Amino acid sequence: MESLLAHEEEHWQRGVVRIAGVDEVGMGPLAGPVVAAAVILSPRDRVDGVNDSKLLDATERAKLDKDIRARALAIGIGEASVEEIERINIYQAGLLAMRRALLALAPEPELVLVDARKINGIPWPQEARIKADATIHCVSCASVVAKVHRDRLMAELDPVYPGYGFAQHKGYGTPAHLEALDRLGPCRIHRSTFHWLGRQLTLFGSASAAGSVTAQQIDSECAPTADAAVAGQFDSEHASAGDAAVARQFDSEHASAADSPVARQLDSE
């Protein structure tokens, strides 16, 4: 725990009190939204057992989520819908969800700590660090809260779209999910621009043939930038083991450091 607090301690000693950690989940699934959480804790407050949500089981995450919510100064949740993912691409949708989570915080942060990539369109200073979700306490807390929130959301959608097993796999590309897609075809919360093992999801029938395996057909409005290297480090651990192939093939050359005009339009509310 001491090591998880080390980076925050440096800022606390400089008089920065409200430090927000932010992280997103749901980048790799074939269905459902991207969800982000932002968490501000009191200086030097520790939630024992916190780690990157991908390294914890569901029971551990649920307990930690309660502890974090009970002790946090502020928590913000942000989502990017399937429709938004389709319009602006998965990379931009993750940034959009994180921005919404941060803008939902009250009180506001003095500093934002984020995993891997900077977020455009927020009024506070920020630091992006690779693997922050496993090395910085407040970002680890945000990872847990986001994961629990999204898992509950997918469980609530399970009876709305019966037969797919969303309560079990949470939208990731497990064998059971792929079998359900072959049997039922995609539903409205499937990401129709995603490919899985050479097949593209489509709402006009079952999975159709595709020429190559790629995680996303990127919206042409999002031009490549010098930040593509960050996207190339897209954390495949965000996906479950069954969906790791999609995450590893995330299309880094189309990632943009700044939000596209479409993303800014979507977030105009």
Predicted regions and their residues:
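RNase H-like, Mg2+-dependent phosphodiesterase core
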Residues: 1-222, 226-227, 235, 243, ...
